[in-house]
Regions:
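Long, structured protein-protein interaction/assembly regions in large complexes
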Residues: 5-184, 190-193, 203-207, 212-217
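Single conserved hydrophobic/aromatic residue that forms the stacking wall/gate
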Residues: 1-7, 11, 271-281
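Generic long, charged, amphipathic alpha-helical segments
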Residues: 200, 206-237
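Short, glycine/polar-rich helix-capping loops at beta-to-alpha or helix-loop-helix junctions
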Residues: 84, 105, 233-234, 253-258
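Residue-level signal for inorganic ion chemistry
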Residues: 88, 238, 262
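C-terminal binding/interaction regions
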Residues: 94, 241-245, 250-270
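Short catalytic-loop micro-motif centered on adjacent basic/acidic residues
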Residues: 74-75, 95-97, 222-225, 245-248
């Protein structure tokens, strides 16, 4: 089961972009067991957070980038109740996808005739489908990345070891960053995103965008990168805004320069290997 089996509770037509965003939001929220909220715009997350309840998770996710969240698609991994529904409609959203909705929540949503509501049912039965893309004269098939890398299996390559709080943030960030368009950089504070830099042609530019989005909340946060840093500049830039720990795959010919930069800034550096971009053809 996947997006194709999700049911719509409204008759408003779904656009091509709507369906892609619903699918992207669903893929991210399925990474988490605890109550989690995801906000997606144009296939990229602009806010993700986990908490003890969905309302707190949603408000934390919104705080990442409220401007970009305007008109976004939201996903949840628990039933949406009335209090959450009231908070959602306080600003414009394009659509919501969740396992279920309380009767009161649906009544609240009915006041927004342009709001698209999708219900998935039990998420435990959902699995990601392979990705199929057309090429000139052929097709490219890639299996979905459903590998869950344990943070305990990662290698600490810096002099300083991570704190428990940093490990929590690094694990959270690693789960989300693989869903950000590459070059992808994500700043996280334990169980919420703080800044996201997506889709840039150079990794340092993605770091700068994440920095811009996170100020003034970046101090004491951690950074996740979907691929290795080809130069030390990404670490140097992150250190300027208070990043304390970094997770990345490693594998650059300049890995030692990157490690040296982390040590100079007293940043904890973890290598995962493989990259979340690795896949099977």
């Amino acid at each position: 089961r996947g997006m194709s089996s999700a049911a719509s509770d409204v008759y408003k037509r779904q656009s091509y972009n709507n369906l892609l965003d619903f699918d992207a939001a669903l893929a991210i929220v399925m990474e988490f067991d605890e109550p989690t909220a995801v906000i997606v715009k144009h296939n990229n997350p602009c806010g993700v957070a986990s908490s003890t309840n969905l309302l707190d998770a949603f408000n934390s996710a919104m705080s990442t980038d409220p401007q970009s969240a305007f008109g976004g698609i939201i996903s949840f991994n628990r039933e949406v109740d009335a209090s959450l529904a009231e908070e959602i409609i306080s600003s414009f959203k394009e659509g919501i996808i969740a396992p279920s909705y309380s009767k009161e929540a649906l009544e609240i949503f009915s006041s927004k005739e342009n709001l698209r509501i999708m219900g998935t049912g039990n998420l435990e039965s959902y699995h990601r489908s392979p990705s199929l893309r057309s090429l000139d004269g052929g097709w490219l098939l890639q299996e979905a990345d459903e590998v869950c890398i344990s943070i305990s299996d990662c290698k600490v390559v810096s002099k300083r070891k991570p704190t428990n709080e940093e490990l929590e943030g690094l694990e959270f960030g690693w789960k989300v960053v693989k869903h950000v368009k590459s070059n992808a950089i994500l700043f996280a504070d334990r169980k919420r995103t703080v800044g996201i830099g997506a889709g840039q042609m150079s990794r340092i530019d993605s770091v700068k965008i994440a920095t811009f989005k996170s100020i003034p909340d970046s101090k004491g946060t951690v950074m996740a990168s979907d691929a290795f840093f080809p130069f030390r500049d990404g670490i140097d830039e992150a250190a300027k805004v208070g990043i304390t720990a970094v997770i990345q795959p490693g594998g650059s010919v300049r890995d030692q320069e990157v490690i040296d930069a982390a040590n100079e800034h007293n940043i904890c550096l973890l290598y995962t290997s493989p990259s979340p971009r690795d896949g099977l053809l």
